[in-house]
């Protein structure tokens, strides 16, 4: 009898265990990992699988049938389109407002606060920027360059990253001298130790309001709804603030 009860208990726990598959914009690489760790300690029966990339790439993959349960975009547009086209079951909900910075390594000898003049420094051969066609942070960075009237002057120096995380890796590795990345990446310990940055004024680009949705695939999982709601909690909002995000409704 004891063996039967033990078997039933184990079977029940296995049924309850769920993997939440999340596609997230690359600017969330550090913040969302920390959030997921906190969540899984709180709900050990759930596991979270995180995939990071450009918002446009995640959008296209979900439309093509990728089995993601929650989609975190670096803007509202992609999340809204998924909802309108029936690929998401929840209306897009803003979770953070992103900021962009001009970042360089401490040993580069460059001062990012001397923007935009620093971009024209003869020592600067390559400037990293995310692809503005499908990466919201890349689009905001291009808008900032245009606002300062230097885009045409530096366009031949631009090195295009697939997403904002790849863009950061270009600068950190020396493949680019400096470049535009998300503040949330610049504040991560591994980048904060080796680099310095200048915060681009918000009025130089469109606001980076970021939204998330539960996908059509995710509606089958109670755990997906649980994590979705956790992201709006006070505990989660503290993590977003830690990584430099502004919070909707608190401005």
Regions found by a protein language model. Name each.
Residues 3-13:
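Sec-dependent N-terminal signal peptides
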Residues 17-43, 47-52, 56, 60-66, ...:
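Exported/periplasmic ABC-transporter solute-binding proteins
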């Amino acid at each position: 009898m004891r063996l039967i009860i033990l078997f039933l208990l184990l079977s029940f726990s296995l049924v309850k265990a769920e993997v939440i598959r999340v596609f997230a914009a690359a600017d969330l690489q550090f913040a969302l990992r920390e959030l997921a760790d906190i969540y899984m300690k709180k709900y050990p029966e759930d596991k979270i699988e995180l995939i990071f990339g450009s918002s446009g790439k995640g959008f296209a993959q979900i439309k093509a049938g990728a089995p993601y349960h929650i989609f975190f975009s670096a803007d509202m547009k992609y999340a809204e389109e998924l909802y309108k086209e029936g690929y998401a079951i929840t209306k897009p909900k803003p979770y953070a407002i992103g900021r962009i910075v001009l970042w360089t390594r401490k040993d580069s000898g460059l001062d990012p606060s001397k923007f935009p003049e620093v971009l024209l420094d003869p020592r600067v051969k390559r400037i990293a920027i995310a692809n503005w066609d499908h990466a919201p942070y890349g689009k905001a960075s291009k808008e900032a360059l245009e606002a300062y009237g230097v885009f045409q002057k530096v366009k031949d120096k631009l090195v295009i990253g697939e997403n904002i995380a790849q863009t950061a890796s270009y600068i950190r590795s020396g493949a680019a001298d400096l470049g535009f990345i998300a503040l949330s990446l610049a504040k991560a310990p591994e980048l904060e130790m080796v680099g310095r940055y200048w915060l681009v004024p918000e009025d130089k680009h469109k606001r980076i309001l970021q939204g998330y949705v539960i996908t059509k695939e995710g509606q089958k999982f109670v755990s997906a709804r649980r994590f979705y709601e956790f992201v709006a909690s006070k505990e989660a909002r503290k993590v977003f603030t830690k990584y430099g995000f502004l919070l909707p409704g608190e401005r």
